[in-house]
């Protein structure tokens, strides 16, 4: 099963108590550098395993990892709650993720405020006494208090305004399971949805390309043939996550599917069928691979990953340490499973306009450069020309902000696409057009300007039709997979020939040129 070109591959990077990061405190110039170097090492590991989205815990328990006008510093960075570590950890993480072609989403823990006497809970309770409810030793923001929605929206607006985040990721956006419900379930869902809507509106008003996401309970509701065992998003904790996708309040979901077998697969398919064209990347409970946490076998997780890919879903690992510690070889498997780079699916429901293509590509022995006016660029490479930009295996750099790339260019061809903030790609700009014919002779198909000679069909190829497309990827004609194809109506130029079966699966067969003498 070849990796797809578009797929969300995610890690939750937990900062509370330094669970995933940091494992040392920033209290001096040297210790700041050490803390930052540890994060860079983790991000390098993520990138090598094909991860393209990092969810970093930004608001923890009424405390944060950036200088905020609303809430104090968390103690995970400096060792002292309320004390700055001497640098902006959120900005640093964003910059380092972007250098590696990865998105960074600010993970915002919404209602839980931690222990009643801890700094975050204590300060917010002092400022807004009626906003926090005590349940046992812990405090929770009251989902039935309208100020909860506006306060959390202000936090998310602050992050969106001040930082180049790619997403706002809401955690625990639901009623606590220990909450004594005094309203109907329908009213409870309205209360939670009101919080989501307030946050969505403030974020999108500032930057409509910033993705709204959350991590709902892994089972949306009971299914006709499978029971959720009393633990689901919709009925139990008033979390209408599928409705948020339908109504455009969420762009992406990371359901916490920390289950196996018939408690996983039917519910994963339900998320896929109710995605409403948005992005779903179920969270996988890889912490259960640790004997101290559970008794899972790595095959439990790898099978889940394979099925998710079959249904066009992404995957998210909870959490970072269990991933990079390679518990039961899960990191090694992910490197093989994600053997090629992947782009995050475009937000076509927000914007579907393709940006301008890059211009003036120049290739030298140690790299290539191009010109353009869009935020990001993707680079493709292969030994044949034109480079197939539909093939994920040809991706060599993604979400690149720079207009150049250092790479060995010997015996290689390149194509560069521009990409806007919504993930829409331009048509490709191909390199080496003048060198293409002699180098790629084995891929050149015979064409006399009227008839194209089709290559013999391999016995293993399931295809009844062929399609001709331009270098930009536009299909211009189709026909049966026979001995030859009439191309008399095609304009002069270079075209790509692809096979096509009834399921829409396509494979590149070669390329050809239409030339006619006057």
Question: Which role does the model predict for each range below?
Answer:
Residues 6-8, 12-37, 95, 105-162:
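Active-site-adjacent "subsite" loops/lids of carbohydrate-active enzymes
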Residues 34-63, 162-167:
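Catalytic domains of carbohydrate-active enzymes, especially glycoside hydrolases
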Residues 49-85:
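Aromatic-lined carbohydrate-binding/catalytic grooves of carbohydrate-active enzymes
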Residues 103-115, 169-170, 188-234, 279-289:
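Aromatic-lined carbohydrate-recognition surfaces of secreted/lumenal glycan-active proteins
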Residues 241-242, 246-264, 278-350:
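Substrate-binding cleft of secreted/luminal carbohydrate-active enzymes
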Residues 333-373, 423-437:
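Pro/Thr/Ser/Gly-rich low-complexity, intrinsically disordered linker/stalk tracts
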Residues 405-425:
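Beta-strand-rich modules
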Residues 437-441, 447-450, 454-456, 492-518:
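C-terminal tail/sorting-segment detector
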């Amino acid at each position: 099963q070849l990796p797809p070109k578009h797929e969300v591959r995610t890690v939750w990077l937990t900062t509370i108590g330094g669970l995933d990061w940091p494992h040392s405190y920033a209290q001096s110039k040297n210790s700041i550098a050490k803390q930052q170097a540890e994060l860079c090492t983790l991000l390098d590991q993520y990138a090598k395993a094909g991860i393209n989205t990092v969810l970093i815990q930004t608001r923890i328990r009424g405390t944060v990892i950036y200088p905020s006008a609303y809430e104090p510093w968390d103690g995970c960075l400096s060792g002292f709650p309320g004390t700055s570590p001497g640098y902006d950890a959120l900005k640093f993480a964003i910059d380092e993720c972007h250098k590696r072609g990865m998105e960074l989403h600010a993970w915002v823990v919404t209602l839980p405020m931690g222990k009643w006497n801890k700094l975050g809970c204590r300060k917010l309770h002092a400022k807004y006494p009626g906003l926090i409810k005590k349940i046992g030793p812990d405090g929770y923001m009251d989902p039935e208090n309208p100020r909860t929605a506006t306060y959390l929206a202000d936090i998310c607006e602050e992050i969106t305004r001040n930082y180049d985040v790619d997403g706002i990721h809401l955690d625990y956006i639901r009623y606590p399971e220990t909450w004594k419900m005094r309203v109907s379930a329908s009213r409870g869902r309205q209360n939670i949805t009101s919080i989501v809507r307030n946050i969505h509106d403030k974020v999108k008003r500032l930057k409509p390309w910033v993705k709204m996401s959350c991590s709902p309970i892994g089972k949306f509701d009971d299914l006709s043939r499978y029971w959720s065992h009393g633990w689901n998003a919709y009925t139990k904790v008033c979390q209408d996550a599928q409705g948020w996708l339908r109504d455009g309040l969420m762009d992406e979901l990371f359901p916490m599917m920390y289950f196996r077998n018939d408690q996983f697969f039917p519910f994963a398919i339900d998320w896929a069928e109710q995605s409403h064209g948005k992005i779903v990347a179920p969270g996988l409970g890889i912490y259960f691979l640790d004997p101290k946490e559970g008794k899972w076998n790595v095959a439990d997780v790898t099978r889940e990953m394979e099925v998710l890919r079959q249904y066009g879903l992404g995957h998210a690992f909870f959490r970072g340490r269990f991933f990079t510690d390679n518990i039961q070889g899960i990191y090694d498997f992910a490197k093989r499973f994600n053997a090629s780079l992947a782009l995050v699916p475009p937000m076509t429901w927000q914007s579907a306009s393709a940006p301008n293509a890059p211009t003036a590509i120049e290739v030298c022995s140690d790299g290539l450069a191009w010109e353009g006016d869009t935020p990001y660029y993707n680079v493709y490479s292969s030994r044949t020309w034109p480079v197939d930009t539909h093939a994920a295996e040809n991706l060599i750099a993604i979400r690149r902000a720079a207009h150049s790339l250092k790479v060995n260019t010997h015996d290689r061809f390149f194509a560069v696409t521009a990409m806007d903030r919504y993930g829409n790609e331009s048509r490709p700009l191909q390199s080496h057009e003048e060198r293409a014919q002699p180098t790629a002779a084995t891929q050149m198909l015979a064409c006399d300007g009227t008839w194209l000679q089709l290559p013999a069909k391999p016995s293993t190829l399931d295809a009844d039709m062929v399609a001709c497309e331009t270098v930009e990827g536009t299909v211009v004609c189709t026909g049966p997979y026979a001995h030859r194809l009439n191309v008399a109506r095609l304009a002069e130029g270079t075209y790509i020939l692809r096979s096509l079966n009834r399921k829409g699966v396509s494979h590149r067969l070669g390329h050809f040129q239409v030339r006619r003498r006057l």
